[in-house]
Amino acid sequence: MIVIMYQQLIAHFDSLGGRELKFSPGAAVFHLGDEVRLVHLVRAGTIHLVRNQADGSALILQRAGPQSILAEASIYSSSYHCDAHAQSAATTWAVERSELSAHLSGSPSFAQAWSQYLAHEVQRSRLHAEILSLKTVGARLDAWMAWNEALPARGLWSHVAQEIGVSPEALYREMAKRRRS
């Protein structure tokens, strides 16, 4: 079901006038407060939607990989409410917000595929919120691993720490504790 939904959504995106944009690792796709002009479908790489906290930490709100729509709720907003940065070399298909909005109004099949995508993203966001509500690093890590099945390569653990809302050091301590057990 989800695969079919994504295929329909991507087919609609491909039919819209847009342009391919490339981002190098670390490059900004947009910043907090920027006017929303484009909606990005990630074709390759990973782009993070990030909210920077007052204490200097960053909370990842979305890890948009291939076939993900970056900051999909931005179509309903005049400005972005967070930052987006490429975590790796990334390519997007960027569609004008106004064209996407018009297509949603004029195509029931696209509106249905869009609604299904948003519903799936709500489910993922609820899981993320649940992880962040857990009190211990261990509980957060357990919940994250239940959803993702395995940790990424060791060099990417700091990304997991950001995603579950803990410092990299706290995650490393938890990992060391588990290795000793």
Locate each region found by the language model.
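A short hydrophobic beta-strand segment most commonly corresponding to one strand
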Residues: 90-99
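Cyclic nucleotide-binding regulatory module and flanking cytosolic helices
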Residues: 1-27, 69-70, 75
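Short, flexible helix/strand-to-coil boundary loops that buttress conserved ligand/catalytic motifs
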Residues: 53, 73-74, 96, 104-107, ...
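Phosphate-/nucleic-acid-contacting segments
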Residues: 135-181
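A small-molecule sensor/coupling module
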Residues: 98-136
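Cyclic nucleotide-binding regulatory domains
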Residues: 27-88
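Short aromatic/basic micro-patch
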Residues: 20, 63, 94
